[in-house]
């Protein structure tokens, strides 16, 4: 038997080696699956530790000889991790050669090998197909400029963000002073784009916007205080938007709030985050419609028509993009050096204008992680045609950055990996005096619950008025959410996605560990009963989260039924907590 297994091991080694050329050439999903199937098939045939040593030796040899191929490296790692512990033998010893493994991963990160869209997509699809949920592709390895890290290290770094679930987005800039109106015309939609919408050149825009923007000291503290009252765990302020107006002092460039208005808004915001123990995030636009070195030619990036005309008339130089990338790096360095940064929300890229070519992404990431190694970043330093799509909404792959971003959209089935949905209160990010299309507290809580139940975070926006005051409608909505969160936040914070892969007509489900489920009920059926496809092993207790009142629970072979007849229901969303060891009945 031992001799037979050795032959099998050798056959596997030869087969996998022959596959390797295909994987290197195609980085394909099918080839990854074939290698994985043969690896697990070989391992499953062995009966003893000695036999496994022979089989695993062949895997270890593949690992050592092909550690510069990221696809093979990941597949072999999965082969090891899915092998029974008593059968790991020589392979485990090979993986203990830490210096060799670290050097291999470092080389991959430095070379950008894991940047390959084909590799990233294939590996992620591979993991999903085989339901290897606890062994995910290392999204951060392959982000040029970001250090490689283990899954354990990544989980630790991402923990506060994954557990926090709810954040406040704050769009405040020079555009806020215009309040949606420019030269007598009212603009609709996202009015922070008003220069683009109006087509104004830089000089015209400055003349109109600067006098109407009047930031007052102390307003940033009001934003963060409201976020705290609403139950937010983090906030994200626009440190600069596409108009290029910096909301912090930038000594090398005078188009900033400190030099034009005498106040450093980012500084006050940073101090407020510290005061209220709030994680401080910064939106950082990579565009700059008005910087003299910004060159949008041939990029497909939006650009105000007036600036194009000024260039054509010789009144404005065409940009020098290498100098612009240095400018981006310089002002980002100012932000990092002067304010505590927990999160960076980059914006934005296009298929033909992204990454190093467009923004110097490698250097920007290196700046961030050299200064703040535990910082978190979204994925918008890059853009890709090879990304998830649902209903025409495209999402950049998470493996470029720490998390995906869905804007003005909540994906019906969530997004693989870490992700966040950002939403507005009334359809615009910046302040608009005429826009009164406010959502309700109920609608917003349901959006929050929908996102969290699908495994994401929810970033909800406010657009302060010209002086920085928060519109009274925004205050009321955030306080309304805060009231609900104070009573029901346990069903949101530190939870993970609905484990059943189906949604229910009566509401949503979140979970905490493997012994707690939260049923968030939007609409109770006329029967007064709701059901979920699970059964409990041993004792199970159902209670109303708000008042701890016990609820009747019964089980059958197909479902668990909760009877809420006669129970007081929350007009926004009622939460029932189920405590007990459960298992899904969905095959």
Can you name each region flagged by the protein language model?
Residues 41-52, 64-67, 85-90, 109-118:
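Charged, low-complexity interaction regions
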Residues 22-58:
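Immediate post-signal-peptide N-terminus of mature secreted/exported proteins
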Residues 97, 110-587:
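Mature catalytic domains of secreted/periplasmic carbohydrate-active enzymes
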Residues 33, 70-78:
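Amphipathic alpha-helical repeat scaffolds of TPR domains
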Residues 1-23:
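Bacterial Sec-dependent N-terminal signal peptides
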Residues 55, 71-72, 100-101:
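Structural recognition of alpha-solenoid helical scaffolds
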